[in-house]
Amino acid sequence: MPYNISVVKGRSYCPSCNKQIRWFDNIPLLSYIILKAKCRDCSANIESKYFIVELVSALSFVFIFYLFGFTSTTILFFILSISFLIIIFIDLKHFIIPNEITYTLIAIGFLKSFDPTLNQYLFPNYINSLIGGGVGYSIIWIIIFVYKKLRNKEGMGLGDAKLLSALGFWFGWISIPFILFFSSIVALGFALPSLMNKSKTMSSQIPFGPYLVLGCVLYLLLLEQIILYLN
């Protein structure tokens, strides 16, 4: 991770005063509201991103559980939604997508493809999964290669290639063109206003990971319509 801080071991602490956060000040959503977004010890402001992550996580979990109930699919989507949130906030701030996240998603995506009890429309078999992973990585790699040849500088990063590969492992090769299309449309929608008011230029660095995530979410939300269209 960017700060080389374990998210598994150790307790949370305030980045301003380095004091450990008490358990009753670490309750998702409630603590942020009760403390009025300030550290109890040093009164430093607590970034709103923590509240946003907790809120989106809670809403995602409720929505996923509503759709799938007590099933292995629910657990898989819990893992995916947490990973998506981590990717979005890290890529937006640091312009990187941690290998720890993408490699874990690739491993889970491939291993779950051997489970015949999972919905085959949602999760592909291992052959489809393997092809999806390869196609996802190859497409971004080709884009990077061509852009560098034409512009003589880096465009997208290999982190994006690994992320699209992971999504291919999860949802198969058929998902790749839809995810790329949706993510490109969303990215264009966000980038155009900045380009028009000249706060960004065509050479500005733009993290594409969050748009791949949003593209994947749109693909999943529209999956039923996509299947009907393809059939």
Question: Could you describe each region identified by the protein language model?
Answer:
Residues 1-49:
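Membrane-proximal soluble regions of multi-pass membrane proteins
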Residues 58, 113, 164, 188-195, ...:
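Hydrophobic transmembrane alpha-helices of multi-pass small-molecule transporters
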Residues 64-76:
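Transmembrane helix-loop-helix
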Residues 157-159, 192-218:
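Interfacial loop-to-transmembrane junctions
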Residues 221-231:
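Juxtamembrane boundary at the C-terminal end of a transmembrane helix
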